[in-house]
């Protein structure tokens, strides 16, 4: 598998506070319980790695958890008392850490690589690399996140949540995730993931 999580659309945001990585390290102590020391080794596959992730992307996710735009009961509690400066410091700290290497499933690598680099033009699925870079390194200035090395289970769950939002799936156990919209149009990741099959999501 290529451990790829496709990201949010580019949206203008208020100017972020300048982050202090040293201050962020002290503030990150509670985060380590789930995401591991330095954010490199989460306790479970459905928790994301944070080490080396783009600073602006991390801050944006914390802001979205706090506002309720991105829903997660655990994270909502964790960010409830964070200030903008706290979030900036945490973003700076985790962005300064060395990302860890993920494990690849050889049965899915070839298909995942083709989809990531070339998409599925017959079905209108764009290449992930167009936004996330040829090696999944992300594009910090646009808040497209680092994808290389991310936990496969987390990637798969997030893509399915984007897909559920894009297709407006119904059901008591359906988990949806949305990202920023362009006017009245659905957000980029909902639109992209809605075109993906289960096998394509697993491969990517």
PLM regions: where:
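Gram-negative bacterial Sec-dependent N-terminal signal peptides
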Residues: 1-16
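Electrostatic cytochrome c docking/interface patches
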Residues: 13-28, 38-46, 95-122
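The feature marks the first
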Residues: 21, 25-67
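Sequence context surrounding c-type heme c attachment/ligation sites in exported
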Residues: 23-32, 55, 117-129, 144, ...
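The canonical Cys-X-X-Cys-His
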Residues: 29-37, 90, 125-134, 204
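Detector for the c-type heme attachment site
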Residues: 34-40, 51, 95-96, 131-137
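Axial heme c-ligation environment in periplasmic c-type cytochrome domains
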Residues: 42-49, 64-107, 140-146, 163-203
């Amino acid at each position: 598998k290529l451990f790829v999580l496709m990201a949010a659309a580019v949206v203008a945001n208020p100017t972020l506070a300048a982050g202090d990585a040293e201050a962020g390290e002290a503030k990150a102590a509670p985060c380590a319980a789930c995401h591991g020391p330095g954010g490199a080794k989460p306790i479970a596959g459905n928790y994301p790695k944070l080490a080396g992730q783009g600073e602006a992307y991390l801050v944006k996710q914390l802001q979205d958890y706090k506002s309720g735009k991105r829903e997660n009961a655990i994270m909502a509690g964790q960010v409830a008392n964070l200030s903008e400066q706290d979030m900036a410091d945490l973003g700076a700290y985790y962005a300064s850490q060395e990302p860890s290497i993920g494990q690849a499933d050889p049965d899915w690598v070839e298909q995942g690589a083709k989809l990531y680099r070339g998409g599925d033009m017959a079905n209108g699925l764009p290449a992930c690399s167009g936004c996330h870079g040829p090696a999944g390194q992300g594009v910090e200035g646009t808040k497209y996140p680092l994808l290389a090395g991310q936990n496969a289970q987390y990637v798969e769950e997030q893509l399915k949540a984007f897909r559920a939002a894009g297709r407006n799936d119904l059901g008591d156990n359906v988990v949806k995730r949305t990202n920023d919209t362009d006017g009245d149009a659905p957000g980029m990741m909902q639109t992209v993931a809605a075109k993906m099959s289960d096998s394509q999501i697993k491969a990517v």
